[in-house]
Regions:
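Phosphate/nucleotide-binding beta-alpha loop and adjacent structural elements of enzyme active sites
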Residues: 1-317
Length: 317
């Protein structure tokens, strides 16, 4: 533990931190109202996670590419203990996952996806059982890590959305290497509320490979991508949608708006990363609630080694 407390960490969440700090300082009244609205939908655990996330977002300095921060200046003792346990867990299991899922060639493995299953482990048992045999949506499929974990819940099919060409090639390899061609449908699309195009920057360093952002000081590559809505893609679908998983790098609100009909018709479980900007963080839960008032929510940190990453909203009826 002593060694861990003295360690420094580098974090690449510059654009995320800045948007939260700007929102807080530019419009405190709206910030407080949105926070109050969000808390009214949550249990005590989620409220605690929300408050801790925002506390860190608002106090951390904006990083540059080589910015380092002392771990003990960021985390409390409980969090430091969790970080140490997470590091031990990763060291013990990472080779197992590489071998089990034929992941040779992956530069960076998101072990947290394999550990937490995008938050699905926290669902009530009856809700998890009810996922079996339904169609799953994997928005922001990356190289296929979340797709691999979703297969453990016995979907009839997984429909993957991934707009980045490099990521899509790796996703196709993961599907082939794991014998999933008949279980997975892939769309080279980003998700939004309408069919449109966008110019995206994809961070290309090894620590952030594949992350898409509007702006970043980190090395990135630009790519024109096509966006569409879940409702448009599924308009001829006749089978029940059981899950909508989204990690769409800041497009979460528009992706949920573009899934309104799907959510109202099928009431799927929703797992959505919400840490990319204030709009995602504060607005997605109330938006889902407006589609169906029976939705329940958890907000969970699904990355122990840096608490600002992978903050996920889990919603179910």
């Amino acid at each position: 533990m002593n060694k861990l407390k003295d360690d420094f960490i580098k974090y690449g969440l510059d654009q995320y931190i800045e948007t939260f700090q700007n929102f807080y300082h530019d419009d405190l009244k709206t910030y407080e109202q949105k926070l109050s609205n969000l808390k009214s939908l949550l249990d005590a655990e989620s409220i605690n996670n929300v408050e801790r996330f925002l506390q860190l977002m608002l106090k951390l300095p904006l990083p540059s590419k080589d910015f380092m921060v002392r771990v003990k200046s960021v985390y409390n003792q409980e969090e430091l203990f969790r970080i140490q346990k997470e590091q031990e867990y990763k060291a013990n299991v990472i080779n197992k996952y590489y071998k089990k899922y034929n992941l040779e060639g992956w530069e960076k493995l998101e072990v947290n996806v394999f550990k937490y299953h995008c938050g699905l482990k926290r669902l009530p048992k009856d809700v998890k059982r009810n996922l079996k045999g339904k169609i799953f949506i994997d928005g922001g499929a990356f190289w296929g890590d979340s797709m691999l974990m979703l297969t453990r819940y016995a979907p009839s099919k997984i429909i993957c959305f991934e707009p980045n060409t490099i990521n899509l090639n790796h996703l196709s390899t993961t599907i082939a290497n794991n014998g999933l061609k008949n279980k997975v449908e892939v769309h080279k699309l980003g998700l939004s509320k309408n069919r449109e195009t966008a110019l995206m920057n994809f961070i290309s360093d090894q620590q952030n490979h594949g992350a898409s952002v509007v702006f970043s000081p980190f090395k990135s590559k630009q790519e024109d991508i096509l966006l569409d809505s879940i409702d448009n893609v599924l308009k001829n679908n006749a089978k029940e949608i059981g899950l909508v998983k989204l990690d769409v790098e800041g497009y979460g609100v528009n992706a949920i708006k573009g899934a309104k009909e799907t959510i109202q018709k099928y009431k799927p479980v929703i797992s959505c990363a919400i840490y990319h900007n204030p709009e995602e963080f504060f607005d997605i839960a109330p938006l889902i609630k407006s589609y169906n008032s029976n939705y329940k929510f958890l907000i969970l940190p699904l990355s122990e080694d840096f608490i600002l990453k992978e903050i996920t909203l889990l919603a179910w009826v």
